[in-house]
Regions:
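Mature catalytic core of soluble alpha/beta enzymes
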Residues: 1-372
Length: 372
């Protein structure tokens, strides 16, 4: 997702302001959850020096530390985290934090709501399609991993959790950022910060007025990436890399003449006070020796990357965790099922982009969308 700035309309839950309001703005950029993150927050000023900046600095420091706290608690690759200990307990019960129990319960909820298309227990299968390894697993490897993953969801007690078998593993990578983004928003609001932009590696929450705007407007403009342009760019990068590896050497003119596609958003949404989360086939993928692209969104029914007609599924919701829990499932469903499914959930809106570039939307978001 790309954020473009505009001026939001007045929100009855917040103090009203003039269109020419001035803001004290602070931001924090950091690396967490294996991705780049950024939190920006603002306080309206009267154009004079105040202590607003000091408050923003402290609030943002606390927000970043909150993110690091959850990463330490839930990273499946971090030795000693609740999830690491659970995955290495050989099927034995392990003590866990109360919030770990909570997010595991929420994971079970989304698993049930999506008929198993969102499932944290699919970690053994997802690991086979690791885009960093760039290796296509054999059918036998996939079936064995599926057998392990299908043994079931963790058993959750008040302060303990237990995986069904010694080989079982889970990962909260598909839901943790949504949960954490919601906690960050709560923390900001507790300090009476009502204007903010939270971006946890693509889990985006917009709060209040778009304080970064140079020209006052009424709403945030949120750009949805075009899968076609991203895939074209990746293809160009692969071709350039192949030339560089050629035993005949690299012809600088050939690389220089390769024009990168102009990456314009597929559409722009005019929004206020919501979460925007996208699942896509183009962000984490690799190309095999035959030129086939394999992405990281695994269909639990097959153990292979989703083969639906969708290239991306964007969920607009009040809670970021809903965006996490449903966007992956919608992408796997395909455009027809996903659109009808989202229409049946009043708390969700969706923008679905097919592999050939067609845009489908739910009825509630149509007035907010502007195609490019």
């Amino acid at each position: 997702m790309n954020i473009r700035n505009a001026q939001s309309e007045n929100n009855p839950l917040k103090p009203t302001t003039s269109e020419n309001a001035e803001f004290e703005v602070r931001s924090r950029s950091f690396f967490a959850f294996n991705t780049n993150c950024c939190i920006k927050a603002a306080i309206e000023t009267d154009g004079v020096q105040s202590s607003s900046g000091q408050l923003l600095e402290k609030v943002l420091d606390d927000a970043v530390n909150l993110c690091f706290h959850y990463e330490k608690l839930w990273s499946h690759t971090r030795e000693g985290s609740d999830i690491w200990r659970l995955n290495h307990a050989q099927g034995e019960a392990v003590p866990i934090d109360t919030e770990t129990a909570k997010i595991l319960q929420l994971s079970r909820h989304y698993r049930e709501e999506t008929a198993g298309l969102f499932d944290v227990s699919m970690a053994p299968v997802a690991e086979l399609w690791n885009f960093r390894k760039g290796r296509v697993p054999s059918p036998g490897e996939v079936q064995l991993a599926l057998k392990v993953a299908r043994t079931g969801h963790p058993r959750i007690m008040e302060d303990h959790a237990q995986l069904p078998t010694a080989e079982s593993r889970i990962s909260l990578g598909g839901i943790a950022k949504g949960y954490i983004a919601d906690r960050v928003v709560e923390a900001l609001k507790s300090h009476r910060i009502h204007d903010a932009l939270v971006n946890l590696g693509g889990n985006i929450v917009i709060m209040g007025r778009p304080f970064l705007a140079k020209i006052p407007q009424q709403q945030w403009n949120v750009g949805v990436r075009s899968p076609k342009h991203v895939l074209q760019r990746k293809e160009a990068e692969e071709q350039a890399a192949a030339i560089a590896r050629s035993p005949h050497g690299t012809d600088p003119r050939a690389l220089g003449n390769r024009k990168q596609p102009n990456e314009e958003p597929a559409c722009i949404l005019k929004l206020n006070d919501c979460s925007i989360v996208t699942s896509s086939i183009y962000e984490r993928c690799f190309t095999d020796e035959h030129g086939n692209i394999h992405h990281h969104i695994v269909d639990p029914r097959t153990g292979r990357p989703s083969e639906s007609d969708l290239a991306s599924a964007t969920v607009i919701s009040k809670r970021s965790i809903d965006g996490d829990g449903f966007s992956t499932a919608l992408l796997i469903m395909g455009s027809y099922w996903a659109k009808n499914y989202a229409e049946g959930h009043p708390d969700l809106e969706a923008v679905l982009i097919t592999r050939d570039g067609r845009i489908e939307t739910t009825s509630g978001i149509r007035k907010a969308i502007r195609a490019r």
